[in-house]
Amino acid sequence: MSLPHATIPTNLRRRAFRRSCDRCHAQKLKCTGSNANLVRAQCQRCQQAGLRCVYSERLPKRNLHKEAAAGTTRATETSQPMTATSSTVFSSLAETPPPYCSPPTHIGTSALKETLSEPSAATLQFYDTSINFDDPESFPGGWPQPNTFRDDANSNESSGIPDLGYDFEGPLDATAPVSPSLFDLEVEGNSSSGQSNTSNTQRDLFESLSDVSQDLEVILHGVTVEWPKQKILSYPIGDFLNAFGRLLLHLQERVITSSNSSMLDGCLQTKNLFMAVHCYMLSVKIMTSLSQLLLSEVMKAQPCGQKQSTRMDWYWSGSTTRNDNGRAEALPSFHSNLHIGELISHLDPFMHALSSACTTLRVSLRLLSEIETALGIAQEHGAAASIRLVLSDMPSTSWQILGAENKTITPASRLLSVLWSDEAGDEEPKSTKASGKTINVLRRCYKEIFALAKKHNIA
């Protein structure tokens, strides 16, 4: 007779035990017992302590994804009755107003006094017993009104709070006062905030002028050292003109100074005047060196050979020159990569150099004239005015730099008269270098270049 086979369920969970005993697991120590699946011997620590090793069953691993999904489902199911409950509560609140929605009770009513507990003896020393909360007349200044959100001017003065003058109930006035020109004086209030703003503006202006001064110094070094080593017509002129434009922009900035300004404001204004005049002198020296290079380039481009003269005659006359045999002379050759803008320089280098020099000097002269106007230099005292007198064939004696003792000239002109005293005295320059008679050299270069332009009908 055979026994029936035992049915083994298929869903039995496999029991797993820890690899370390309970004592080693609790102390976070490495267990030295046996790692056999069925028989686990005692570890050395348990043997030395005379204890029995116990290996507990390992807890099953948790499935976090399933638990999170189950938690979301429970939260969804729970929120539905809560939503219904909350809607019921809010509807009941809308029907029956709460007690705190009723009109507020006066602070001096007997109900409030009954609510307050009787103060202790230690607290009574901080109370003013002369104030009766039932009598508004006993409160100093009367009861404060419930809709009072701002004090009047009298209360501000009495409390020591300055009235800033801002009225948020009316429209804001965004118009700013018109400022005078640079280095002028305007009467303003003597408030400390106004003086501080003026000082900060003067410092910002000095930093801007210092940056322009550094750029002009770099350009002056390039004109006197780097540019003579190469063709002047191929050198970029944009940096020079942009520096002139920035100087003009900073000189046109408005700085308000007060008649009661501090000594510091006066010192800052004088420092800005010196820096502005320094930038102006750098500009004049750059124009002097540049005009010398342009005049030298024009002189080099003058026709001196038969080949160049024939090419210029062919371009300007419109007829072809023929030799004794009646054959036409060789036409000028053109490079395959010749650009349209380079065609005039290829056919007539002299006219190209002369027209380029005239254009550069005209633009520089106009910027220099506007800088003199913004700086406050009178036309009869500036270098630009002297150049115009030369170009108009007027006697040079009509232009002169007045002495410092003349009180009618501006501060910038008075300062220039001192700084130019050793560079603009004689009519003829003692040296052709930029360090010599700067203005006289500048006037001579302008006169010679525009005389050639007038001769060739391009002035």
Swiss-Prot record:
Q: Which gene is annotated as encoding this protein in its UniProt record?
A: mlcR
Task: List the record's Gene Ontology CC terms alphabetically.
Answer: nucleus
This protein's name: Transcription factor mlcR
Bias class Low complexity marks the residues at 69-78
Which stretches of sequence are listed as region Disordered?
64-84, 135-170
PANTHER family recorded = GLUCOSE TRANSPORT TRANSCRIPTION REGULATOR RGT1-RELATED-RELATED, MALTOSE FERMENTATION REGULATORY PROTEIN MAL13-RELATED
Query: What InterPro entries does the record point to?
Result: Carb_Metab_Trans_Reg (IPR050797), Zn2-C6_fun-type_DNA-bd_sf (IPR036864), Zn2Cys6_DnaBD (IPR001138)
Q: Which domain of life does the UniProt lineage start with?
A: Eukaryota
Location of the DNA-binding region in this protein: 21-53
Query: What use does biotechnology make of this protein?
Result: Compactin (also known as mevastatin or ML-236B) and the intermediary metabolites Ml-236C and ML-236A are inhibitors of HMG-CoA reductase involved in cholesterogenesis. Their hypocholesterolemic activity might be useful for lowering cholesterol levels in the blood and reduce artherosclerosis and coronary heart disease.
Q: Which UniProt keywords apply?
A: DNA-binding, Metal-binding, Nucleus, Transcription, Transcription regulation, Zinc
UniProt entry tagged with the keyword Zinc? yes
Q: What is its main location?
A: nucleus
Q: What does this protein do?
A: Transcription factor that regulates the gene cluster that mediates the biosynthesis of compactin, also known as mevastatin or ML-236B, and which acts as a potent competitive inhibitor of HMG-CoA reductase. Binds to the consensus-binding motif 5'-WCGG-N(6)-TCGG-3' of target genes.
State the Gene Ontology terms under molecular function.
Answer: DNA binding; DNA-binding transcription factor activity, RNA polymerase II-specific; zinc ion binding
- Where does it reside? Nucleus
